[in-house]
Amino acid sequence: MQKRHAHVSPTLDIMAKKIFSLPEVTAAFIRDILELDVADAQIVEGSQPHGMAYEEDDLFSTAVDVRAKLHDGTEVIIEIQIRKQQYFLNRFHYYLANQLVENVQKLRQQGQTHKMYEQMEPVYGIAILEKSLLLDEEGAINKYWLTNSRSGKQLKAYFKNGKHQNLLQVAFLELDKYNK
């Protein structure tokens, strides 16, 4: 039994963007991978402009494959990687950290400087990888967040409305391990 069309891969950018353009599909995927209580997801524009010009560029910007905003304000970046790249993990960290900074800068521009840290929303990431990146891990899905190195206790931040959760969390879905 063939599980998917031989010439169409869900990791191709155009296919992935089509699949994740449906909010209910994106919400279900995030719910299953990150194990979050997701009521719905709004798909938002994925470009990340940077206010600082670099030598060869007038305005530097990056684009993530899919960016969703959840009902509680949490943002989730979904990045699809077909080829194994040596610095993918570095780039993925950059996307998440950059989104946190961009969100705080928006609050600052709105004049919310005294409450901008209270108003911050978590940013989570899911990387869908065609080829394994985490060779020492056996499972197809692996999740990471900040923890105490001795106790293993999660480092959670406080947010508006009394939320107490991780500020950053990442998950990797390695497709070549999925059917093993």
Each PLM stretch: what is its role?
Residues 1-180:
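Elongated, amphipathic alpha-helical interaction scaffolds
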